[in-house]
């Protein structure tokens, strides 16, 4: 769920999860257009992953809880997750690791999505 995703982000990286809420075209609610950079691509992949999770019957990625471990920045999804939980956990784990490895451009925080995120 989103609370667990926030914790994964903070486990894997050094930035606060709030730095990603309104970043680029895909970090935060919704998304459109072309990702502005590597970090924004991480968010688009995460959005697409949640979209795939929703194809699993009764799987609600924004609310479903899952089991995972965070130890010294290493994220592991536990084996006791059901199919939906395992899928969402992996979406969040991959995204948190992607966020941690991507450069952060302050100029892409809170951009004007109407002008910068529409494909022409």
Swiss-Prot record:
EC number from the UniProt entry: 3.1.1.4
Cofactor binding annotation: Binds 1 Ca(2+) ion.
PROSITE patterns: PA2_ASP, PA2_HIS
Record's subcellular location: Secreted
GO BP annotation list: arachidonate secretion; fatty acid biosynthetic process; lipid catabolic process; phospholipid metabolic process; positive regulation of fibroblast proliferation
InterPro entries with a match to the protein in the record: PLipase_A2, PLipase_A2_Asp_AS, PLipase_A2_dom, PLipase_A2_dom_sf, PLipase_A2_His_AS
Catalytic activity: a 1,2-diacyl-sn-glycero-3-phosphocholine + H2O = a 1-acyl-sn-glycero-3-phosphocholine + a fatty acid + H(+)
Keywords of the record: Calcium, Disulfide bond, Hydrolase, Lipid degradation, Lipid metabolism, Metal-binding, Secreted
Cystine connections: 11-70, 25-117, 27-43, 42-98, 49-91, 59-84, 77-89
PANTHER family xrefs: PHOSPHOLIPASE A2 (PTHR11716:SF94), PHOSPHOLIPASE A2 FAMILY MEMBER (PTHR11716)
Family to which this protein belongs: Belongs to the phospholipase A2 family. Group I subfamily. D49 sub-subfamily.
Name of the protein described by the UniProt record: Neutral phospholipase A2 3
């Amino acid at each position: 769920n989103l609370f667990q995703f926030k914790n994964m982000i903070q486990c894997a990286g050094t930035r606060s999860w709030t730095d990603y809420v309104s970043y680029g075209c895909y970090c935060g609610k919704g998304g459109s257009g072309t990702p502005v950079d590597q970090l924004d691509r991480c968010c688009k992949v995460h959005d697409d992953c949640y979209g795939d999770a929703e194809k699993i019957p009764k799987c609600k990625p924004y609310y479903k809880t899952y089991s995972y471990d965070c130890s010294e920045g290493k994220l592991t999804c536990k084996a006791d997750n059901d199919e939906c939980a395992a899928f969402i956990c992996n979406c969040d784990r991959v995204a948190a690791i992607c966020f941690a490895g991507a450069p952060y451009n302050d100029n892409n925080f809170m951009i004007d999505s109407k002008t910068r995120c529409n494909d022409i």
